[in-house]
Amino acid sequence: QLHPLYLSGCPTTANCGSLGTPTNPALSCEHLKSVCADTASDFYYIESAGLYHKVFCEMDIEGGGWARYGRSNQGTTWNYVDEDAAEITLDIINASEVKEMTDLKYNRFLVQTDVVFKMKADDSVNPSRLTTRSLPWLEESPLFIPDYGNDHTRIEFPSGSVDRVTCIPGSSSKCGQGGGLPTANGLSKPFFFQSLFFSPRGTGASAHNDQWNRNKYTWDGSYYFVYAK
């Protein structure tokens, strides 16, 4: 049986006003965009592979037709810059969103954020553990600085990219030596952050003689979105 908005296998703009509603769900955000090109970004109902979801469809970026996941309006919370004391846990993409991405079998992804991210361990142990999901496979993987950070190990977003990190060494480092870290000055494979546990405390976290805090992190911004189709 053909979907009600398909005639002889070809999409039609008939009933665009009802497509994506509870009584007439679309097959995907991409399907909704292809049938109803002028559809605005908003929440719509999607039914695919026997699964029924209410999804925010982004229709304006990169050709539109993307399902959007993540958080926004976090500017008063995500304001940690060179933090060396506060221990925090942040959920960026929740487990139900990851399950939905998996259930709906997305294979194209786009990460957008205004967050500035950095984390370092300098001759100390940084207990911070960041949970990532690989793209496009959505495999869970931890990201952390293993053992002592040696002379200096820092990870951050590289210039012009927010779906991977680079590892910046000092005279010695833990870059490329576990924890999901890329090689020195290299790039990781694409991923998105699912959750973050930042803890600047740990063995050798500060040098008391000169008050030099060896562990720091920065997570400063207002939104983090993962788009999928």
Swiss-Prot record:
Q: Does the keyword Lyase apply?
A: no
According to its UniProt record, where is this protein mainly located? secreted
Glycosylation sites recorded in the entry for this protein: 94
UniProt keywords, alphabetically:
Glycoprotein, Secreted
SUPFAM superfamilies given in the database record: Fibrinogen C-terminal domain-like (SSF56496)
InterPro entries per the UniProt record, alphabetical: Fibrinogen-like_C
Subcellular localization, per the record? Answer: Secreted
Q: Which GO terms describe its cellular component?
A: extracellular region
Segments forming a coiled coil: none
Judging by the UniProt lineage, the source's domain of life is Eukaryota
Q: What is this protein called?
A: Echinolectin 1
Q: What lineage is this protein's organism placed in?
A: Eukaryota, Metazoa, Echinodermata, Eleutherozoa, Echinozoa
